Amino acid sequence: MQEWPPTAQQLMRSRYTAHVRGDADHLFRTWHPSTRPADTDPEPGNEWTGLTVEAITAGSVQDDDGVVEYTAYYVSQDGEPNELHEVARFVRRARRWMYVGPADVV
């Protein structure tokens, strides 16, 4: 069994890797049930090319809430370069970090 990421930033990075690999199961497991959509499959045809962490607020091993601002870069099916910028909220419940969504989601 794979160890659960100990910080919000590490969970966010593992979720980026899940997008790169097309690992819908990891995305499902790490998405908070209160905001998780029915379909967590990554967008087919996107080639993820990079990730930059812009800022981190809390989200350490001692915290129960955290915010990670990041930009993920990808090339879409039509060959166009794109980026996804998000200020993402994470919560830790039962010693596991979960992705909630954009930081304005309660």
Please report, for each region that a protein language model flagged, where it lies by residue:
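Short beta-strand edge/turn micro-motifs at domain boundaries
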Residues: 82-106
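Tryptophan-centered motif/residue detector
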Residues: 31, 48-50, 97
